[in-house]
């Protein structure tokens, strides 16, 4: 804020300096959809900080709902020689459903699972990447060490022999599936097929059993970064429901249904241990049946149009049917099929 005093500050007898980074700005009033990876390809230190501790307080990918930014920012911090970085800020569970604390930021494991997994990966990147090591320019530096980020896939990925983490569905195969001890996921992967929309954690115990922790499905009801957030209007809802999970690992192939909680898989048997595990009490937000849908901006003539919508209900959803009417009054009905979490999809034929 006072760049004309920077030389005097850095020349003083101080132990270190702090910096911050908001590459997408602050308080845009809406979610930012642009690709910001080029903007975080490098972090340029504008001042002479030789011989001083370098600390980041604070940083965030503000107003970005994607899950691809945090590891890239961690990479650039380490390249610039930073030794400490603090993300701003984590939303308490009771407030995350409203995002009223400071709406340009939104981070919570339950309500923003993809972003939370991305931050988990970024923490690992910051700890493991060498200070001062560069990885080239964008897009070549989208893969660095054990890590990969992708705007197109909305993905942060860590692929290591014992640790495999992904913020969204990926087809990238683990480098050593037989050695895996920890999996942190959101979406699906070659080793975990899951049709819920919450985060999950799989940890191999010393006795060979697996501890499985699963979080609720979540759906956004409005732009969480808007200027109208209030305590009487929830920007996201969570719901606990049984979902199918399939695990495909050497020595462990299993197919079962789980609801949010903690489980132990041992010798071919799944046991719920939520009560003993200290799992947080998560109250469902879904109180009535509702549909949340963002209309497509454009459709290609003659091609099938895929329509997606989130359908929530406190009761089990039996079926979802899309009713439509074309120009000049031609009506049609198309059945919608469940995908992950609350999402249902239908393809409208292009010849309608």
Residue ranges, per PLM feature:
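Glycan-association/targeting regions that enable binding to alpha-glucans and other polysaccharides
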Residues: 276-352
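Glycoside hydrolase catalytic-domain groove-lining segments
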Residues: 7-63
């Amino acid at each position: 804020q006072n760049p004309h005093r920077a030389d005097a500050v850095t020349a003083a007898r101080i132990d270190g300096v702090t910096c911050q980074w908001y590459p997408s700005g602050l308080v845009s009033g809406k979610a930012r959809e642009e690709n910001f990876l080029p903007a975080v390809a490098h972090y340029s230190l504008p001042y002479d900080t030789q011989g001083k501790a370098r600390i980041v307080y604070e940083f965030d990918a503000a107003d970005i709902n994607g899950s691809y930014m945090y590891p890239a920012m961690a990479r650039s911090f380490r390249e610039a020689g930073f030794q400490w970085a603090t993300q701003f800020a984590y939303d308490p569970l009771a407030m995350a459903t409203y995002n009223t604390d400071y709406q340009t930021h939104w981070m919570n494991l339950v309500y923003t699972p993809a972003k939370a997994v991305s931050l988990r990966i970024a923490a690992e990147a910051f700890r493991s990447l060498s200070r001062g090591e560069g990885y080239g320019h964008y897009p070549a530096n989208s893969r660095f060490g054990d890590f990969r980020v992708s705007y197109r896939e909305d993905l942060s990925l860590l692929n290591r022999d014992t640790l495999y983490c992904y913020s969204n569905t990926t087809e990238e195969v683990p480098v050593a599936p037989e050695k895996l001890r920890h999996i942190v996921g959101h979406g699906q992967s070659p080793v975990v097929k899951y049709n819920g929309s919450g985060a999950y954690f799989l940890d191999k115990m010393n006795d060979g059993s697996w501890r499985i922790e699963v979080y609720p499905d979540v759906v956004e009801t409005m732009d969480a970064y808007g200027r109208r957030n209030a305590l009487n209007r929830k920007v996201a809802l969570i719901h606990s429901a049984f979902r199918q999970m399939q695990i495909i690992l050497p020595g462990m192939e299993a197919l079962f249904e789980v609801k949010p909680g903690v489980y132990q898989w041992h010798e071919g048997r799944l046991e719920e241990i939520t009560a003993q595990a200290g799992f947080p009490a998560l109250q469902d937000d879904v109180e009535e049946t509702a549909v949340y849908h963002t209309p497509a901006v454009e459709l290609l003539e003659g091609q099938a149009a895929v329509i997606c919508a989130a359908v929530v209900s406190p009761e089990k959803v039996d079926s979802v049917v899309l009713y439509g009417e074309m120009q000049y009054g031609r009506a049609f009905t198309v059945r919608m099929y469940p995908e992950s979490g609350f999402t249902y999809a239908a393809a409208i034929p292009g010849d309608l």
